[in-house]
Amino acid sequence: MNDLIFFPLALVMALAIIASAALPGKDRLACGSVSGAGTNYQTILVEGNDLCRMNASGQSELQRQEADGKITAISIAAGAGLLGDRPDRNPHFRLAADLETQFAGHQIKVTIVARPSDERGASVFQANYSAGQEGNSGWKTFRMMPDYKEYSFLWDVPPRGAGETAVDYLAIRPVVPSKVRSIDVKSVRFDRIRKTPAS
């Protein structure tokens, strides 16, 4: 083989091997904190593959529902008496620092699209927006319809000083009177409604 062909071809093959080794997670979902990524912070929507950002804290179990290789919903299951009161010790979305900063000092509307799971479905679920040591919304309770429906609540996120961050979470859990109960969450939306008046 001619050197003019062999060496460039060998270089291309070597670069392809290095690139495939350096990017082992290139097909994995980018799961982590929920972030606005510099977009319009008036509305943040978590749906589809972004649902992988939910953490199964506490003694809970998450299961992805998929169609055509994409997440369509996430099932949250828990046993009776196994979840504590702290939002970060329950199934939750962790909000990134950019959302903490943008939401601080504002009224936020949280809208969750959910339903009882087909198996062991809960009839009631709860949600809690926590701003860490700054406080939380308390557990908001919703009685569900059989099909997907929107459930919303408002909360005034406490203001923070410049450069000050907390650890914000949105926790979502089934209410479990006995045995195990499960809910399906299709999407979560955060709407920044207005700046909270100074007290």
Model-derived features with residue positions:
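Extracellular carbohydrate-recognition regions
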Residues: 7-9, 13-67, 197-199
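Short beta-strand and strand-turn-strand segments in soluble, beta-rich domains
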Residues: 90-92, 130-139
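Extracellular carbohydrate recognition and processing domains
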Residues: 134-167, 178
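Short carbohydrate-recognition loop motifs
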Residues: 65-89, 143
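Beta-strand acidic-aromatic groove motif in beta-rich domains, primarily in extracellular
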Residues: 119-130
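Extracellular beta-strand ligand-recognition surfaces/modules
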Residues: 156-197
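Trp-centered recognition loops
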Residues: 107-109, 113, 146-153, 183
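Extra-cytoplasmic beta-strand recognition segments
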Residues: 95-120
